[in-house]
Amino acid sequence: HWSDDYVYNLGVGFDSQPHNLGKTWFPCVDNFTDKASYDLYITIPNDMLSSCGGLLTETYNNGNGTKTDHWVVNQEISTYLISFAIGNFVLWEDTYQGLEREIPINVYAKPNQIDKVEATFTNTKAFAAFFEDKFGPYPFNRISYVSTNLGCMEHVDNVALSSSLITGTSNMNSDFFISHEMSHSWFGNKVTCANAGEMWLNEGFATFCNNYYFTEFYGDDFYFEEMGKRIDDIIMSCHATEGWHPLNALPLDITYG
């Protein structure tokens, strides 16, 4: 995706069937079970930043106004979860003391957003602590988000987050997406669905994690209100679309709802 001075990939497409899009930018066996580690070499102008999955291990000065960043993902991950973003980003950094180690927190934001990052991501450490307590140590290298113009996507170490969510306030809407994408680190990224027909499990677990976290912090009334909305939607709409399916091999056009 190109947008002004920014270029990035998104690992899934809502309207693509199947949804996984590793094959759109590198040769691969683009299924959910053929996992691999990655080395990425990104050559960019000196005044730009790259953000990819894994860790930035080295930057080479090419002597011609460009540099090459070397990113390494040591964990084996599915093809749709590897990613890159390049642009006129400003990097905001923090750390979170996890169960086993200190984990970097990175946010790659546009220059006009950087002053809004800290307030927007106020609860990020609380999300990480909650999920680690419930599901075990954070399984990847860093907690990292990059501002993009199109949607949200749980790439390993490089979550695409809609720039419209970086508002300078910690609110329910931004917290929902920040925590939702983080929870995929355990459900979707570490443990991945076996095929496209079961991709709804990735989203189902992440939706559960949202409700689990918010119920813990806002109480049972929040949970019952949210579940009530979902039940109302089912009662009001599913009969019109015959919207019922067995809980496996779901049609791909309803993976995301």
Predicted features and spans:
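Acidic/His-enriched low-complexity segments
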Residues: 1-139
